[in-house]
Amino acid sequence: MAVVALNKENFKDTIVNNPFVIVDFWAPWCEPCVSFTPIFEAAAAANPDILFGMVDTEASPEIAEYFEVGKIPGILIIREQAGIHAQQGEIGAPALDKLIEWAREFDMKQVREYYAEQDAKK
């Protein structure tokens, strides 16, 4: 699957409509970000069941601010609309592959229970 450009117009719908999303926060002036792009694109091609999206922090700073991204590149993994991992700083292909494997195996049971409890309180 191709990497999707995420912005304030499509971010929420993307998260709501896709059960597994990995977001790369980047900027065009950031050399480590630009170097990471082919790694991120290769991971997207190797994992077509996951939506991979990129947020340009210059064009969409409000998204980066909302998720408190203080350093780029940054990765955010979202499953079932819940952020399960955030990482800031450079990451190579082997580490990204391990992170994806971890996210696939992450047990969402406690997350679901937490949100069910929160909904019940409303």
Short names for language-model regions:
Residues K71, L76-V111:
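Non-catalytic, surface beta->alpha helical segment in thiol-disulfide oxidoreductase systems
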Residues V16-P28:
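Short active-site neighborhood of thiol/selenol oxidoreductases, capturing the structured segment around
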Residues F11:
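Substrate-binding pocket helix/loop in short-chain dehydrogenase/reductase
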Residues M108-K122:
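CheY-like receiver
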Residues C30-C33:
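Short cysteine clusters
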Residues V4-L6, F25, F36-E62, V69:
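Thiol-based oxidoreductase modules, predominantly thioredoxin-like and allied folds used
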